[in-house]
């Protein structure tokens, strides 16, 4: 059985696993494969949280020695419509992202990878992301792309490291649980 830390908060289960960064990168990163998956998303290239990752947002992963992967497992009541996914996920995502950024700030040279935003980036509330007009990000201190934006396989991460399956909605309803996955590389 896989060893990881577990914590509960308001029905959400938080699971944490620390692994060797080099091993995680070799086993779970396939940027070309996942870039193709990301291209079908309507947010692709429209926010600084999404790929393609270019310029200063490119990361050299070689200096990192550990990767702390954090999963928020969110129970979903039966027959919850898919249309409610954002309203369920966003408050938990924002809390998890704040914690990831706090962890990043505590250790020099570390880097947080936040969760995929279901509605794109939400730091420019009310205005379009600066990426659309080819301007620099307005909130570089807050915006961190997700693991999948850098080509990490989250389904395999979830299965191999946390013994959980990535579930998908069916017939217009959400599955029995949803997950958010973030990380801090140090």
Where are the model-predicted features located?
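Non-catalytic, low-structured ubiquitin/UBL-interacting segments
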Residues: 1
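Catalytic cores of enzyme domains
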Residues: 4, 13-186
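N-terminal donor/sugar-recognition subdomains of glycan-related enzymes
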Residues: 7
């Amino acid at each position: 059985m896989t060893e990881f830390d577990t914590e509960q908060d308001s029905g959400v289960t938080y699971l944490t696993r620390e692994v060797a960064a080099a091993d995680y990168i070799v086993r779970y990163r396939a940027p070309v494969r996942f870039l193709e998956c990301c291209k079908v998303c309507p947010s692709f290239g429209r926010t600084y949280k999404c790929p393609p990752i270019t310029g200063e947002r490119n990361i050299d992963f070689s200096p990192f020695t550990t990767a702390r992967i954090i999963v928020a497992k969110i129970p979903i009541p039966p027959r919850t419509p898919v249309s409610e996914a954002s309203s369920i996920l966003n408050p938990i995502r924002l809390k998890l992202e704040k914690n990831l950024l706090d962890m990043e700030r505590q250790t020099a040279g570390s880097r947080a990878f936040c969760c995929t935003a279901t509605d794109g980036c939400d730091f420019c509330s009310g205005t379009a992301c600066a990426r659309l007009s080819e301007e620099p990000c307005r909130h570089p201190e807050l915006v961190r792309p997700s693991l999948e934006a850098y080509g990490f396989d989250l389904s395999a991460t979830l299965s191999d490291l946390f013994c959980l399956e990535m579930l998908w909605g069916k017939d217009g309803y959400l599955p029995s649980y949803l997950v958010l996955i973030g990380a801090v590389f140090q």
